[in-house]
From Swiss-Prot:
The keyword Hydrolase applies. Keywords: Hydrolase. Belongs to the Ap4A hydrolase family. Pfam families: Metallophos (PF00149). PANTHER family: CYTOCHROME C5, PTHR40942. GO terms for cellular component: cytoplasm. InterPro entries: ApaH, Calcineurin-like_PHP_ApaH, Metallo-depent_PP-like. Gene3D superfamilies: 3.60.21.10. NCBIfam families: apaH, PRK00166.1. This is Bis(5'-nucleosyl)-tetraphosphatase, symmetrical. GO terms for molecular function: bis(5'-nucleosyl)-tetraphosphatase (symmetrical) activity; phosphatase activity. The lineage of its organism: Bacteria, Pseudomonadati, Pseudomonadota, Gammaproteobacteria, Legionellales.
């Protein structure tokens, strides 16, 4: 399923796909991605692919992953924190040696700017009405219903697509504010929204984020819980498909939530789910962690 095999003839109308497969955090693991597509017998003329963010970094082949995904017909992509990090590095808003990463090939690629432009036009949330499913990288904070979450995600998309996207990205990193208030404005408002959708694991009932803890669900700090334990599945009435939290190993304790990060970049496996049947597919990691 090499990217070069996807041509204009194959980019069929996927308004009514046979199957929609959503794949967990790829993080530059191109080889495993191709093996997973072989396992599910992916047909680009009949099936649609989606990804819950963190397409790049940690694995060895982020450039190949981006080029392949860009070649697909209308993939369902949401951004993760590592994807935003690539945008910040790629546009020269942070020194390349600020943190360890495996993004050097992307940063030196002749088509770097084309890939960055394509990436920054991806949203933080995708709502697939026909499948009653929401795709998001980290999760949905409890104080927002589905409609509100989609509207807040649009604020980030507007900033990323707008003329001042560099200023937005330059000031994106940070843990504060960690508490949502309706009167938040400017960069503080955008940073909270972005952190909630791309970095959140634990929070309290009002959406106060704990961005320091990364462990299993039983390791939550006092008064905090995994975000999905606060949500009401009857109220949401949709499946929430997410990644980001490798320590969950693809397991979520709440109904209608589907965790897909199974730690491929850490040496474990890459996982996909068929949104129609909820059947899961996984392949083991073959790529050694490069950082």
């Amino acid at each position: 399923m090499d990217a070069r095999a996807i041509n204009s003839r194959e980019k069929a109308d996927l308004k009514y796909p046979r199957n929609t497969y959503i794949i967990g955090d790829v993080q530059g693991c191109y080889r495993e991605l191709q093996e997973l597509l072989e396992l599910i017998q992916f047909d680009s003329t009949k099936d649609r692919l989606g990804f819950v963010g963190d397409l790049v970094n940690r694995g060895p082949n982020s450039l190949e992953v981006l080029r392949f995904l860009k070649s697909l017909s209308s993939p369902l992509i949401v951004l993760g924190n590592h994807d935003l990090y690539l945008l910040i590095l790629g546009y020269g808003l942070m020194p390349e040696d600020s943190y360890e990463h495996t993004l050097h090939a992307v940063l030196q690629a002749p088509d770097k700017l084309e890939l960055l432009e394509w990436l920054r036009h991806s949203p933080l949330i995708r709502y697939e009405k026909s499948l009653s499913a929401v795709l998001v990288h980290a999760g949905l904070p409890p104080q927002w219903n589905i409609k509100e979450s989609i509207l807040h995600a649009e604020e980030i998309s507007t900033a990323l697509k707008g003329p001042h996207y560099l200023a937005f990205l330059k000031n994106l990193f940070g843990n504060e504010p960690s508490q949502w208030k309706e009167d938040l404005e400017g960069q503080d408002r955008l940073r909270y929204i972005c952190n909630a959708f791309t970095r959140m694991r634990f929070c309290d009932a009002k959406g106060h984020l704990d961005l320091e803890s990364e462990g299993k669900t039983n390791q939550a700090p006092s008064r905090f819980r995994p975000w999905f334990e606060w949500r009401n599945p009857q109220e949401d009435n949709v499946d929430i498909v997410f990644g980001h939290w490798a320590a969950l190993n693809g397991q979520s304790s709440a109904p209608h939530t589907h965790a897909l990060d199974t730690g491929c970049a850490w040496g474990y496996k890459l996982t996909a789910i068929n949104l129609k049947t909820k059947e899961r597919f996984s392949v083991p990691c073959q790529s050694a962690l490069r950082m």
